[in-house]
Amino acid sequence: MNKKRIAVIAGDGIGKEVMPEGIRVMEAVADKFGINLQFDHFDFSSWDYFEKHGQMLPDNWKDQIGGHDAIYFGAVGWPEKIPDHVSLWGSLLLFRREFDQYINLRPARLMPGIIAPVVRRDGTPRQPGEIDMVIVRENTEGEYSSIGGRMYAGTAREIVMQETVMSRVGVDRVLKFAFELAQSRPKKHLTSATKSNGIAITMPYWDERVAEMAKAYPAVQVDKFHIDILTAHFVQRPDFFDVVVGSNLFGDILSDLGPACTGTIAIAPSANLNPERHFPSLFEPVHGSAPDIAGRAIANPIGQIWSGAMMLDFLGFRAAHNAVLSAIEQVLTPASDAPLTPDMAGNASTSDLGRAIARQIQL
């Protein structure tokens, strides 16, 4: 079987602790399914690298990782040492833009053994699988542009501007991906996040493109909500949603809120995709570097492991993806008595949980 080369970037904080468990599980499932994975480790995109070199990435970073089949990423950021906008714009956001990873995909599913903080209207707890949505976020333009600036800094006339950029190509390709995904799922339901009653130029354009794209997908039920009430609906009735698509900013907000509604953001995965595969796609947990718990060996590795499963799926190994998801669900099932990390009311270490999932795969 052809070798798949994976660029491994652990990054900062707990990224360095959860990444070994992600690789442990990837190696276990690769061994079971006869998949040839080569993991190449890189130390950049971290505070340690910045401290030594004065920049987040080497000048030839694209040459070093651009030929890989995928990037397996941990976390970046250490605000006490380096401002977030420096670490993010100097690494992760560069990966997304230079490698045209225009789809950010984040599933949010209520897993066994996890208590959702949002109950049903009658006060009863939600059951595993009752919340099962995917947030599709535009990942390369929108509100997160570098167009803008500061004038008259430090004076009473100080002005700060940052422009939102929406192109037809950029909007249409993320909407097409979202509609295709919705059409492939049982509910066939797509929700668009907007704010066209207040953001009177870019958001009406977004709405127009959604309406136009919907004509090509008559089997998909489409609705839209303004972002403020949409966040309320996420909390009140998360089971209503299936595929949710949003701009860079709105998708960013919703793709943290969605997993939070399922009980713990620590298990949430994400994929930054270049669907045409002209460049490597990047797979990372939703949680950040969490400096407050770094070094204590208590970080939950499931987000890293689940992101690895998404990577396997994108590389064409659907059965391996399913095996990893099944192992996660089995370990989280209360009857399994498996070791759990403190965020899930356990006292196990990061490696205890990673080993338990790897063992489950090997059964």
Where do the model's predicted regions map?
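Short glycine-rich or small-residue beta-strand-to-loop segments that form or flank ligand, phosphate
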Residues: R5-I14, Y72-G77, L190-S196, W306-D313
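Glycine-rich phosphate/diphosphate-binding loop of Rossmann-like nucleotide-binding domains
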Residues: A7-R24, V29-A30, T155-D228
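Buried hydrophobic positions in well-ordered alpha/beta secondary-structure cores of metabolic enzymes
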Residues: D12-G15, D69, V136, A178, ...
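Buried hydrophobic packing segments
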Residues: G22, M26, V210, Q304-L312, ...
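N-terminal beta-loop-helix "entrance" segment that forms/cooperates
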Residues: G34-P58, F234
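N-terminal glycine-rich phosphate/adenylate-binding segment common to multiple enzyme folds
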Residues: Y49-M161, L249
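Glycine-rich phosphate/nucleotide-binding loop
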Residues: F50, F234-S336
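Glycine-rich phosphate/pyrophosphate-binding loop and the adjoining helix
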Residues: T140-E141, S146-S192, S196-A200, R318, ...
